[in-house]
Amino acid sequence: MPVALAASVLIFAALAAHSVAAQELTPRAYWPAPKGTKVLVIGYSNAEGDVLFDPSIPLYGVDSELNAGLLAYVQTLSLWGRSSNLIVELPYVWGETRGLVEDTPASRKYSGFSDLGITLSVNLMGAPSMTVEEFVAFRTDPHAILGASLKVIAPTGEYDETRLINEGANRWALKGELGYTLPLSTKWLLDFEAGALFFGDDDEFVAGKKEQEPIYSAQMHVIRRFSPGFWGSLNFNYFTGGRQTIDGVELGDVQRNSRLGATFVFPVAKGHALKLGYAVGWLTRFGTDFDQFLIT
């Protein structure tokens, strides 16, 4: 059962981490697992509405259906005596996008591998590296946790510089984040996360060199633990920034948006867990007004 609990926590972090990175909702991302835990993740997400892989695309009146399958591997480590996780994830995306390009209707169906993501997280306070027995004791008397993570997104996805819509972004991205978990009781937790996502340049974008300012994000989660491996949460985030420059021209696409979501995770067999998640746009200034469903 402890391993099933660890899997349920890490599965959500892995799948959400390869959504649009600044928009992700990741409850319990820094909750520890026993050292030596290994998790294979198979997941699926569906998003419908005003959503694009890349909001710099000059497409208006967007109506998309985006699907993503995910294969990921999670390894729990002990770094400097602290509980840590290494996550490697490879998504495959497919879907259809419709909209207007200079008042002309346009659409495209697409499928292919998106960009590879690698994340390393370390719990700096409150969660040392633990055996299964120590983890069981921690779960019954949890302490406040301070964690940090670094995610690298590599430009490995499929990309065609003659197309507006691509599966890969053709640029490097780096996200740093701090997370804090505050136990209110053995059943209730509060999660807080703050991060910054930095982008490299895309020198082959169809409309000219593309540059983008960082996107800053904050999350809060209210979590209820029902039994070992079974928990639910209400999730909220806010993200801002990300103004883009295309061929030297600044766009008016600064994001100041937020999303609301809910998550349920429960064990289905020894060493296995199922996660269901749903999120919607709440406050939308630019893009991100879409519904998303997740299952792993």
Question: Model-predicted segments: where are they?
Answer:
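Surface-exposed strand-loop-strand hairpins of Gram-negative outer-membrane beta-barrel proteins
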Residues: 47-68, 104-106, 161-166
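Repeated loop/turn-to-beta-strand initiation elements of outer-membrane beta-barrel proteins
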Residues: 50-51, 81-84, 127-128, 187-190, ...
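Outer-membrane pore/translocation modules
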Residues: 94-211, 252-253
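Residues that define the transmembrane beta-barrel architecture of outer-membrane proteins
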Residues: 36, 63-71, 111-118, 144, ...
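Transmembrane beta-strands of outer-membrane beta-barrel proteins
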Residues: 38-40, 84-88, 118, 144-150, ...
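Outer membrane beta-barrel transmembrane domains
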Residues: 204-296
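Transmembrane beta-strands of outer-membrane beta-barrel pores
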Residues: 44-50, 90-96, 124, 152-158, ...
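Residues on the lipid-exposed face of transmembrane beta-strands in outer-membrane beta-barrel proteins
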Residues: 42-44, 71-75, 118-124, 150, ...
